[in-house]
Amino acid sequence: MDYNRMNSFLEYPLCNRGPSAYSAHSAPTSFPPSSAQAVDSYASEGRYGGGLSSPAFQQNSGYPAQQQPSALGVPFPSSAPSGYAPAACSPSYGPSQYYPLGQSEGDGGYFHPSSYGAQLGGLSDGYGAGGAGPGPYPPQHPPYGNEQTASFAPAYADLLSEDKETPCPSEPNTPTARTFDWMKVKRNPPKTAKVSELGLGSPSGLRTNFTTRQLTELEKEFHFNKYLSRARRVEIAATLELNETQVKIWFQNRRMKQKKREREGGRVPPAPPGCPKEAAGDASDQSTCTSPEASPSSVTS
């Protein structure tokens, strides 16, 4: 068998893979003499970094104990038989150690520690490997730190002080309008509707509670005109936020109250000239005459 020809195909595994190229079960116990000579010849030429010169290869009688990869920078535990010469890159470097590149042993991905150390040195200076060592890129800081927040505080305080508006000066008290006796309203406490047996009173039994403003406006209108036309009644209802029926009933009740006071006083007010006596009754809500004291807007036909 031509071992020299076979070794031409095995020169890369023997020189580059090192001791971990073969497992403990599949590695041969010894090399033929011709294969050892081939390895020696390749190492002496310096074509590959995996062999020693022939004197160093002949002096050593076996490999050092092989070790399994446990962590980066830790040698492999022993798993291969002895009887092999140690592999080195060159006579100037001494015995070499190989480490896996994050792959299984069968993949054959190994590198030399000396080259890896040089690369790490360059990375630590250039990029700050592992966060240690100064580099051209300084460590990043949070965008909003305590110093920035402290610097923003005076600006925010100034903005807040500008946003605060000065209180408006109190307006001078306007003189109250003159109040006549007929404008004064005597309020009675509202009577609650009686609760029926079914639990609620009938809607017709509920009284409308007028506000003071509504009563004042109704009294003013009654003082000038005791009878309202339908157009005027609708206008007053819209102004006071009432309905037409409420205004009509209030004027009817107010006329009845006025007549009761006149009867109790023993004096009958004279009827307006030109107005028949029947028109002053309570049977109708309209009047065919015009009162001399009525306002121009309350003139009825």
Curated annotation (Swiss-Prot):
Region ranges (Disordered): 20-77, 127-149, 255-301
InterPro entries: HD, HD_metazoa, Homeobox_CS, Homeodomain-like_sf, HXA1/B1/D1
Organism: Pongo pygmaeus (Bornean orangutan)
Stated name of the protein: Homeobox protein Hox-B1
CDD domains according to UniProt: homeodomain
Subcellular localization(s) per the UniProt record: Nucleus
General function of this protein: Sequence-specific transcription factor which is part of a developmental regulatory system that provides cells with specific positional identities on the anterior-posterior axis. Acts on the anterior body structures.
GO MF terms held by the record: DNA-binding transcription factor activity, RNA polymerase II-specific; RNA polymerase II cis-regulatory region sequence-specific DNA binding
PANTHER family for the chain: HOMEOBOX PROTEIN HOX-B1, HOMEOBOX PROTEIN ROUGH-RELATED
Membership in a protein family: Belongs to the Antp homeobox family. Labial subfamily.
